[in-house]
Amino acid sequence: MTVCVAQAERGASELESKAMVKKSNDAALLVAHRIAEVVRSKPNCVLGLATGSTPIPVYQELARLHREEGLDFSQVRTFNLDEYAGLPPTHDQSYRFFMEEHLFSKVNIKPENVHFLSGLAIRAEDECIRYENALQTIGPCDVWLLGIGHNGHIAFNEPGSPRDSRTRVVCLTQSTIDANARFFGNDKSKVPTKALSVGIATIMESREILLLATGESKCEAVTKAIVGEPTNAVPASLLQRHPRCCFYVDEAAGAEVAETVTE
């Protein structure tokens, strides 16, 4: 596992860093440019994509690269990590809506090449099986972009999720509901309590994993994921076992990691 810490006005740490940059947004740009490299080298690549506020700058940069430099998405296939149970794709907090708004409507990706979990599936368990089978048939993902939750979750794999988990229906923890309430007008009662999510084993099959974390609020989770022992109590820590996983974190999110490694 490699750690890329975006630092401001300080010497390089002893981390296995590939880049030292000054602005938080630069961590997102590094991720976007790595994804662009994969798209250029393998036009029909399979991308796993995340949602939430953290990857928005990544998608903005990918859209710019398409618009200004001709980055071609016409053969790219994509899978999203998860979806809220009960939300239609037209809901402004559904992850399909998010992807259309922030990336898919801005590049030349083909609708038949994008894959989502349906939050409205009558038989959610069957929908999860369908999605996992599609991933196994079309994938594995060449790159999977991840974020990290305050409690160390990846996708909606909450603490305690089995290492061998596959796409399934999950119950969200109260801490995740609390954290996501900001997207629902700060009304916790409007946040779905269940979701459909790819599993840890599914993510680990990706050829490459890029985890992006920014801001002080993610510092504790990042530290546990990178410095602590791999444990399903902190799902992101299990990524340490992946041969090609890179954490891209800004100075705020990576502060304790840098201090731990350089002591």
Swiss-Prot record:
Catalytic activity from the UniProt record: alpha-D-glucosamine 6-phosphate + H2O = beta-D-fructose 6-phosphate + NH4(+)
Highest taxon, organism lineage: Eukaryota
Pfam families, sorted: Glucosamine_iso (PF01182)
Annotated transmembrane regions: none
Active site residues of this protein: D82 (proton acceptor), N151 (for ring-opening step), H153 (proton acceptor), E158 (for ring-opening step)
GO biological process terms, semicolon-separated: carbohydrate metabolic process; glucosamine catabolic process; N-acetylglucosamine catabolic process; N-acetylneuraminate catabolic process
GO MF assignments: glucosamine-6-phosphate deaminase activity; identical protein binding
EC number: 3.5.99.6
CDD domains on file: GlcN6P_deaminase
Enzyme class: hydrolase
SUPFAM superfamilies: NagB/RpiA/CoA transferase-like
GO cellular component: cytoplasm
Keyword Zinc: no
PROSITE patterns: GLC_GALNAC_ISOMERASE
UniProt xrefs under PANTHER family: GLUCOSAMINE-6-PHOSPHATE ISOMERASE (PTHR11280:SF5)
Protein role: Catalyzes the reversible conversion of alpha-D-glucosamine 6-phosphate (GlcN-6P) into beta-D-fructose 6-phosphate (Fru-6P) and ammonium ion, a regulatory reaction step in de novo uridine diphosphate-N-acetyl-alpha-D-glucosamine (UDP-GlcNAc) biosynthesis via hexosamine pathway.
Family the UniProt entry places it in: Belongs to the glucosamine/galactosamine-6-phosphate isomerase family.
Name this polypeptide is given: Glucosamine-6-phosphate deaminase 2
Species, as recorded: Giardia intestinalis (Giardia lamblia)
Gene: GPI2
